[in-house]
């Protein structure tokens, strides 16, 4: 054992070390035995009774203080000696931090809590109390339940809407023999051959009822362009493609714009400029092209009859046709909705329409028919030629005369 260690032990315990393996017995007073046995005593805790009394006599500070029991221990080896310090465990610090539980032998390190930190602690406690009260109110709040009468009313409204559509459908089917509503592919296939008529309409070489209505709307306006307020005041029934409806009318207009967007944008006609390329295509050109499709579907004599028919079936287009699926993939949604509402086949649009796939199969079968089919085809072409001749001759009795759209 080194000389420094022997001298240190002799000074603390007042006994001499006879050899390196001598047993050291420490005697503790009754006051020290009351301390926590779990806390290991360090060498610096062996102080005189006078120092203990002076430590106990220190008054407690008014402000919060944090007392740390710091102890130092010396360790040495045969070669050299070093000094190390240790801090008691967190459980001991917590115990010593409470008033009245401070160790008499502890070396107090006074720590003053900043005023800002105390305020932060108070605010945090207030927030915790508020959160607890809110959580308590949420626990007692009754859960929101869906009212069954609301669901039943919504179902009743949907069923009533289908009843109304069925009534309008049957009314126009009986009075006007409205053709089956076309899908988007069918519509574009029938209207494709009439799209080039846009050139003649823009040059003023072909009369147009819808252009005449558009020009009247422009003449009533005092603005250079069609405003939102003026558009809302327009009677859109005069710009609707009859039984085709607005939805199919807009679909055809998209195809027209893909071909004539630039030409419409650069056109110098004041009516075209007032409406703008998009609206002029939506509400003038598209319904005009669909008028020729209507003439073919119904086998009418001239375009005047088609215009009259289109004006008479506008209610059907806005209420029935616009509610029917435009594409084939929408049929599944319609069927599921009818099943959910418990409605029969008479409410389905496919009861009054032809599926495009089945219709194309019928056309392919008819193409392989007999000579009688070819003979009827020639007669049909002859009748169609006679009708077109009659249309060209009857220009004088049309209510819509060719317009000077180029001016």
UniProtKB/Swiss-Prot annotation:
One of its GO terms (cellular component) is nucleus. Residues 372-384, 392-401 have a biased composition (Basic residues). Its main location: cytoplasm. Residues 29-41, 49-61 have a biased composition (Basic and acidic residues). It is found in: Cytoplasm; Nucleus. InterPro entries: RTC4, RTC4_C. Residues 17-100, 354-407 are annotated as: Disordered. PANTHER family: RESTRICTION OF TELOMERE CAPPING PROTEIN 4 (PTHR41391:SF1). May be involved in a process influencing telomere capping. This is Restriction of telomere capping protein 4. It comes from Eremothecium gossypii (strain ATCC 10895 / CBS 109.51 / FGSC 9923 / NRRL Y-1056) (Yeast). The lineage of its organism: Eukaryota, Fungi, Dikarya, Ascomycota, Saccharomycotina. The gene is RTC4.
């Amino acid at each position: 054992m080194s000389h420094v260690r022997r001298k240190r032990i002799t000074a603390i315990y007042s006994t001499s070390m006879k050899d390196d393996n001598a047993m050291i017995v420490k005697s503790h007073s009754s006051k020290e035995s009351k301390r926590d046995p779990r806390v290991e005593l360090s060498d610096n805790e062996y102080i005189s009774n006078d120092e203990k009394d002076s430590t106990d006599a220190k008054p407690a500070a008014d402000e919060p203080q944090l007392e740390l029991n710091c102890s130092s221990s010396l360790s040495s080896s045969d070669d050299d000696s070093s000094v190390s310090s240790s801090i008691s465990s967190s459980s001991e610090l917590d115990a010593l931090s409470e008033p009245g539980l401070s160790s008499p032998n502890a070396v107090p390190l006074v720590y003053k809590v900043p005023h800002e930190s105390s305020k932060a602690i108070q605010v945090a406690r207030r927030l915790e109390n508020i959160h607890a009260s809110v959580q308590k109110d949420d626990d007692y709040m009754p859960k929101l339940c869906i009212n069954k009468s609301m669901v039943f009313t919504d179902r009743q409204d949907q069923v009533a809407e289908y009843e109304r559509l069925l009534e309008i459908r049957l009314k126009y089917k009986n009075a006007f023999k409205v053709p089956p509503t076309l899908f988007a592919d069918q519509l574009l296939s029938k209207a494709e051959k009439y799209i080039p008529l846009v050139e003649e309409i823009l040059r003023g070489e072909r009369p147009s009822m819808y252009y005449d209505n558009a020009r009247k709307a422009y003449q009533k306006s005092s603005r250079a362009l069609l405003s939102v307020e003026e558009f809302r005041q327009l009677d859109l029934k005069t710009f609707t493609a009859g039984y085709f409806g607005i939805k199919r009318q807009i679909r055809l207009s998209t195809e027209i714009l893909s071909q004539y967007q630039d030409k419409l944008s650069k056109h110098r006609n004041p009516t075209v400029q007032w409406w703008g390329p998009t609206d002029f295509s939506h509400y003038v050109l598209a319904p005009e092209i669909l008028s020729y499709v209507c003439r073919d579907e119904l086998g009418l004599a001239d375009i005047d009859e088609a215009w009259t028919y289109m004006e008479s079936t506008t209610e059907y287009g806005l209420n029935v046709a616009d509610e029917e699926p435009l594409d084939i993939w929408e049929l599944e949604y319609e069927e599921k909705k009818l099943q959910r509402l418990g409605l029969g086949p008479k409410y389905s649009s496919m009861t009054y329409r032809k599926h495009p796939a089945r219709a194309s199969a019928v056309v392919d079968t008819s193409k392989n028919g007999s000579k009688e089919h070819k003979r009827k085809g020639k007669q049909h072409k002859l009748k169609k030629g006679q009708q077109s001749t009659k249309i060209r001759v009857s220009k004088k009795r049309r209510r819509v005369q060719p317009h000077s759209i180029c001016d």
